[in-house]
C-alpha cells in the first residue's frame, strides 16, 4: 500500500563527491534542516527540508564504481534527478509508456520504496524518478540524516526547479500526461507545472535551439542571502532567488 494518494513532486537531487561539503551552504546559508538519509548500495543519500516542505537530496558515491561515479566523472557536481512519489508504480509506468517513454531501472524489490526512471534523453534533459513509498516493516533500516549545523538560520522556501525544454508539446506530455501535473503560463511566458499538495513546482522555458535540462533551483527568503551569481562552486547548481 502506497503512503501517498496522488502524484507529488517530492524532491530535487544533487550529486556531490562528499555529502558533508553541502552543509556550509544548505544549512549555514539556506537554513536547511537534516531530514532523512541512508546508505543505498553504490551511493548514500541525505535530504534537507526547507520552509513549506521543499526538499533537496544530496547523493554521495560509495565504493570504486557505480552510476553516480560515472555521472560525476562526466558532468561534475550538479542536479541529477527529480523525484515524484506516486500511489502506484505500475500505473505511473503504464501512463509513461502510453505517452511514448521507455521505463528504465524499475525495481520493486523493496516494499518501502518501489522505483522506476525516465532517461534524460527522453525526459527534457533530466532523470525523472517515480517512487511508490510503502509503510516501514520489521526489517526496516533506521534513517541516518545528513550532517546538520547548530544555530543555523531560519530555512528559506524552495520554490522548485526551473528547466529548459525545446518543445511545448513534449513538456506538457511529460509533466501533465505522464506525471499528472497541471500547467499554467508563468509571468515570462514559461510553462509552470504544479501538483496539488506538493510544496514545489517546475517551470519550463521553451527554446527550440538550446540544450534541454535544469537551469536553476528557485527559492525565496525573508532574510538577505548571499548567493553566487553562477553555479555554486561546490554544488555545481545555480540557486536563484525570487520575491516572496
Please give the residue ranges for each predicted region.
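N-terminal beta-strand motif that seeds the catalytic metal site of vicinal oxygen chelate
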Residues: 1-23, 77-84, 133-173, 217
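Vicinal oxygen chelate
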Residues: 2-3, 56, 93-160, 184-210, ...
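An N-terminus-focused feature that recognizes amino-terminal "leader" regions
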Residues: 2-61
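Amphipathic alpha-helical segments
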Residues: 19-33, 90-99, 167-182
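Short acidic/glycine-enriched loop/turn segments that link adjacent beta-strands
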Residues: 40-44, 78, 110-114
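Conserved hydrophobic/aromatic beta-strand scaffold that supports enzyme active sites
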Residues: 45-47, 83, 115-117
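Long, hydrophobic/aromatic-enriched structural stretches that serve as scaffold segments
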Residues: 56-67, 76-87
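Donor-sugar nucleotide-binding helix/loop cap in glycosyltransferases
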Residues: 72
Amino acid at each position: 500500500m502506497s503512503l501517498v494518494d496522488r502524484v507529488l513532486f517530492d524532491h530535487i537531487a544533487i550529486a556531490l563527491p562528499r555529502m558533508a561539503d553541502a552543509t556550509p551552504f544548505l544549512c549555514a546559508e539556506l537554513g536547511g534542516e537534516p531530514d532523512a538519509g541512508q546508505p543505498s548500495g553504490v551511493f548514500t543519500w541525505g535530504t534537507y527540508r526547507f520552509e513549506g516542505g521543499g526538499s533537496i537530496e544530496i547523493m554521495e558515491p560509495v565504493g570504486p564504481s557505480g552510476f553516480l561515479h560515472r555521472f560525476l566523472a562526466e558532468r561534475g557536481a550538479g542536479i541529477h534527478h527529480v523525484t515524484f512519489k506516486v500511489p502506484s508504480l505500475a500505473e505511473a509506468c503504464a501512463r509513461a509508456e502510453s505517452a511514448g517513454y521507455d521505463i528504465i531501472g524499475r525495481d520493486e524489490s523493496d516494499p518501502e520504496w518501489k522505483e522506476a526512471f525516465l532517461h534524460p534523453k527522453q525526459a527534457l534533459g533530466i532523470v525523472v524518478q517515480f517512487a511508490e513509498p510503502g509503510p516501514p516493516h520489521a526489517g526496516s533500516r533506521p534513517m541516518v540524516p545528513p550532517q546538520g549545523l547548530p544555530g543555523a538560520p531560519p530555512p528559506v522556501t524552495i520554490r522548485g526547479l526551473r528547466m529548459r525544454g525545446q518543445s511545448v508539446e513534449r513538456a506538457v506530455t511529460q509533466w501533465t500526461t505522464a506525471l499528472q501535473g497541471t500547467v499554467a503560463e508563468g509571468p515570462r511566458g514559461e510553462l509552470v507545472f504544479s501538483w496539488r499538495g506538493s510544496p514545489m513546482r517546475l517551470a519550463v522555458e521553451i527554446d527550440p535551439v538550446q540544450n534541454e535540462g535544469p537551469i536553476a533551483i528557485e527559492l525565496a527568503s525573508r532574510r538577505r542571502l548571499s548567493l553566487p551569481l553562477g553555479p555554486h562552486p561546490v554544488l555545481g547548481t545555480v540557486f536563484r532567488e525570487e520575491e516572496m
